[in-house]
């Protein structure tokens, strides 16, 4: 929808219990392989070759996201500017192995955009570790590409909402290349003592996978479904109305 009509969304980045709920740590290791760890899932995987690294298309796998992120960062032949006979040789040329540790303190399928924001966090950590000089907009764009690699698809609102702090209105123009403009909004309705206690983030325990929902919406778009297109247009207007209400302190 954003490609031919432009998109609008009001988004709020929050911490949970005073901590960033998604955290990623990257450090070098002496062995020329890649070690992936998940604190919340209690899982670990050691990657020693390109085939294992590019095995990232299993939806729900604990390490699909870091595998795809490393692939995009150039640690797989398809995205590398140089050719190497093996992953071990590439890591040796890089100077070390890599160890990535993930912590996701949000239930999977919560609807809070966890997967997209985690992907951006992993890409950001790899960017810092490897000195790739990506900015926030680059990271959000690469997150779109990463989700295509995972076959889950997705839009841009989740990662922009998490990577850029605070309350904001995100808007994009129609066109194949989506570069949303970030307009920050006042946060008094969420932080002022008179209003702060009016907001509650409550976990129902109900989960869902975005892939199926996205497939249904995209299919309806291709079929030019009137009801679906009408709802999407209403959602875009609703975002603008909501931003105006926040600006008015209403």
Listing of model-derived features with the role each one plays in the protein:
Residues 1-92, 132, 141-151, 159-250:
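C-terminal nucleotide
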Residues 47-54, 96-108:
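Glycine/charged-rich beta-loop-alpha catalytic/anionic-binding loops adjacent to active sites
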Residues 69, 108-110:
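Helix-loop-helix module between adjacent transmembrane segments
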Residues 104-106, 148-149, 155:
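Short hydrophobic "helix-edge" motifs at membrane interfaces and signal-peptide entry regions
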Residues 110-132:
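DPxDG-like acidic metal-binding loop motif
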Residues 116, 154-155, 159:
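Conserved phosphate/anionic-ligand binding catalytic regions in large, soluble enzymes, centered on
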Residues 136-137:
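A sequence/structural signal of beta-propeller blade repeats
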